Amino acid sequence: MIITSLLDTDLYKFTMMQVVLHQFPGAEVEYRFKCRNAGAPGIGKLAPYVNEIREEIRGLCNLRFQDAELAYLKAMRFIKSDFVDFLGIFKLNEKYVSVTALPSGEIEVSIKGPWLHTILFEIPVLAIINEVYFRNTQKQPDLTEGRKRLDTKILELQADGLRELKIADYGTRRRFGKVWHEEVLRTLVTRLGTGMSGQLAGTSNVLFAMKLGLTPLGTMAHEYLQACQALGPRLRDSQVFGFESWAREYRGDLGIALSDVYGMSAFLRDFDMYFCKLFDGARHDSGDPFEWGERMLAHYVKNRVDPRTKTLIFSDALTVPRTIELYQQFRGRCQLAFGIGTNLTNDLGYEPLQIVIKMIRCNGQPVAKLSDTPSKNMCEDEKYLAYLRQVFEIG
């Protein structure tokens, strides 16, 4: 099986799931799969592999958390014991997922059920789709090319003047395969080093963090703030409601706010002095990262907060050269973190699949994001999107 542990996912799934257990245990949601570059040159069809994908999901749904895995989670300062107890009896249920081959040669994946019981599907299902696709289309993968490309990245990061630059692995969902993912991480650990003096800050993957002694990284994803559109008191206040609910859960811990659910301008309107002080920083995931960083720093200054005490996290389609450019622009002006995904874990010379699974409904109503990159928006209800734009004053 591709997925052999329920920890083989991103940390933010657990940090969000804990909020769901404590604050929104009754929420019902629906997620939908999309391949953003389907039909593009070099991208094959997924429909031929639909039975294999279903088989792997069946295997995923037979997994339980092991005692050592639960102990690892329990040792994290922000994970509460009642949540670990819940995970001790948890398993994913296949009835909440359907995978269908479409006449176009694409596939439809729908995940629908209680948020608490469906939140852990997204990352392993994406990793399954990716690995099934690549093991069928690249039966003899060019690992030599992959290693060469990784070596180039490492040498770029070790150039003069970049000693303080740290990167993190955010590549679970779109990795070429699990074995390759582990090799990449082991190589980075050996070559870049970890801890205070190393250049590898950690990984979003909880299983590999546990296995390799790395720091697991992550706070919140778009789905959390999107669900708040249906769970909060008023749509206009849903972003504030999301941040306040997060703060109620974590009391200042895990303080990185995601900034692009309604675009940067709406984020800055809501992210007032209170949130500037309370949260440790913000994460960039769409739009121009240089412009975003400058606006973020100016916003801190305007709210009488020293930007040097705050962290800017960049995680949008990063490559090593782009990471270095951003580091050079913002070094010394704030704390910095860089999460590199596909470019680390799926760069062997083959065209990667740009696949996502996004929440589209919560408690029966549409939810959406209006990110700073229009192609990243995903909602089936045009009327709702128009309403959202109006409410958040987006042009």
UniProtKB/Swiss-Prot annotation:
**Cell membrane among the record's keywords?**
no
**Where would you find the membrane-spanning parts of this chain?**
none
Q: Which reaction does it catalyse?
A: nicotinate + 5-phospho-alpha-D-ribose 1-diphosphate + ATP + H2O = nicotinate beta-D-ribonucleotide + ADP + phosphate + diphosphate
Pathway membership, UniProt:
Cofactor biosynthesis; NAD(+) biosynthesis; nicotinate D-ribonucleotide from nicotinate: step 1/1
SUPFAM superfamilies found in the cross-reference section? Nicotinate/Quinolinate PRTase C-terminal domain-like, Nicotinate/Quinolinate PRTase N-terminal domain-like
User: What is the main EC category here?
Assistant: ligase
Post-translational modifications: Transiently phosphorylated on a His residue during the reaction cycle. Phosphorylation strongly increases the affinity for substrates and increases the rate of nicotinate D-ribonucleotide production. Dephosphorylation regenerates the low-affinity form of the enzyme, leading to product release.
Write down the Gene3D superfamilies for this protein, in alphabetical order: nicotinate phosphoribosyltransferase (3.20.140.10)
Please provide, in alphabetical order, the Gene Ontology terms of the cellular component aspect for this entry.
cytosol
Domain of life, per the record?
Bacteria
**EC annotation from Swiss-Prot or TrEMBL:** 6.3.4.21
| Pfam families xrefs | NAPRTase, NAPRTase_N
User: Is Phosphoprotein set as a keyword in this record?
Assistant: yes
Stored PANTHER family: NICOTINATE PHOSPHORIBOSYLTRANSFERASE
- Family of the protein in this entry: Belongs to the NAPRTase family.
Q: What is this protein called?
A: Nicotinate phosphoribosyltransferase
Per the UniProt record, the source organism is Polaromonas sp. (strain JS666 / ATCC BAA-500)
